[in-house]
């Protein structure tokens, strides 16, 4: 009997896959849930029960939140990565780690086939296929939902015919909650004009009085929130979320180019990622040189694009990560942030590495490290080439 590992979430599509692979294809199904930090213990237990009720041979939960942070999220912070200057790659980064974990599990148990429940309409199918082909290249990739092109109603009828009686209620909005943000999809995101209403977002406004928090970074990593230290950065991220989410902070709509070549739109709420990235970015403005910031921003654009499009295993990402890590040697300090309903403001920083030091001068006020003559000479040299260019153009025009 062929052994197949299935990426399993407990939803309609992956539940269909279990019965289809087991009953129709005669395969031994081993389901895998990958928890990147977005599930509660109760949800994990419920998904495991659903898997066994459907008839899987074994079910495995891969807990990869710490690995997800260490191998991905911290580099998204180091690079201040926001896709199209908006989206913190909440789902795209998570999906890649889910795909990698499923593939690694399939390899560990010697499975000859590997399956996922993605449709043929989005990015996830590519991310899963790529990870599977790279990590378990000899395994057959099976994609029942994509290949059979079944409607939701057809899947429900199939499962009913197999004796699976569950309430397959389709929510008005598709919610994907994760450690690095939550995506929100609905009819409004299927066109270019409408916007998600208040009730679409899973976190509602419950706090209205503004407050201030502090975030302490050491070599680019968040280590303390409001002077409370965290050994595990994942818990620090969750703490920022707990403080900011009641203000309904971090909502936006991402518009981008999908891997399959069409434009796509998705809403999201990501209070912790946006606050952490913007705070980290302000600290970097104070402690990095102009050219460090310039080149890091350029590399971050490429890093985010490659990661979003499923190229996590591309070696150049390791090269960019090495640059990011080296750039964080002086990114140490405390950032002050104001929280208010629907918005936040990064107020200021304190750092021993702050290059905005009054020892050398205050912008527009006083110079302590140079004289007027120094500036006069510098300005002459700095403008020399363009002055020569201008003169040559004038002489050439006179010869006409």
For the regions a protein language model found, what residue spans apply to each?
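Nucleotide-activated chemistry modules centered on ATP-dependent adenylation/adenylyltransferase
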Residues: 1-400
């Amino acid at each position: 009997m062929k052994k197949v590992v299935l990426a399993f979430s407990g939803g309609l599509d992956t539940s269909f896959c279990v019965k289809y692979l087991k009953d129709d294809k005669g395969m031994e199904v081993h389901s895998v849930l990958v928890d990147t930090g977005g599930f509660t213990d109760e949800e994990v237990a419920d998904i495991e029960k659903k898997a066994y009720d459907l008839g899987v041979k074994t079910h495995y939960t891969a807990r990869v939140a710490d690995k997800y942070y260490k191998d991905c999220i911290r580099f998204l912070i180091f690079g201040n990565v926001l896709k199209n200057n908006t989206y913190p790659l909440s789902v795209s980064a998570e999906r890649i780690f889910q795909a990698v974990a499923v593939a690694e599990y399939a390899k560990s148990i010697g499975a000859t086939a590997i399956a996922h429940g993605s449709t043929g309409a989005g990015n996830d199918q590519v991310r899963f296929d790529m990870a599977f082909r790279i990590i378990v290249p000899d395994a057959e990739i099976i994609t029942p939902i994509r290949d059979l092109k079944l409607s939701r109603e057809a899947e429900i009828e199939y499962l009913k015919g197999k004796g699976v009686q569950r309430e397959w209620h389709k929510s008005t909005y598709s919610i994907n909650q994760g450690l690095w943000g939550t995506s929100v999809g609905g009819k409004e995101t299927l066109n270019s004009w409408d916007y998600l209403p208040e009730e679409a977002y899973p976190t509602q406004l419950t706090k209205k009085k503004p407050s201030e928090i502090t975030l302490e970074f050491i070599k680019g990593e968040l280590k303390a929130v409001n002077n409370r230290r965290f050994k595990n950065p994942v818990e620090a991220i969750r703490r920022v979320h707990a403080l900011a989410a009641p203000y309904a902070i971090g909502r936006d709509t991402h518009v981008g180019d999908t891997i399959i070549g069409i434009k796509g739109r998705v809403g999201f709420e990501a209070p912790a990622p946006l606050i952490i990235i913007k705070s980290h970015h302000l600290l970097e403005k104070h402690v990095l040189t102009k050219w460090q910031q310039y080149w890091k921003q350029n590399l971050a654009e490429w890093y985010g694009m490659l990661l979003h499009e499923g190229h996590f295993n591309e070696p150049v990402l390791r090269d960019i990560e090495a640059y990011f890590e080296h750039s964080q040697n002086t990114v140490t300090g405390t950032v002050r942030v104001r929280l208010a309903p629907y918005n936040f403001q990064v107020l200021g920083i304190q750092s021993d590495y702050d290059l905005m030091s009054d020892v050398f001068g205050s912008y527009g006020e006083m110079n302590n490290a140079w004289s007027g003559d120094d500036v006069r000479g510098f300005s002459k040299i700095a403008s020399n080439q363009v002055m020569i260019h201008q003169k040559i153009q004038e002489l050439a025009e006179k010869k006409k």
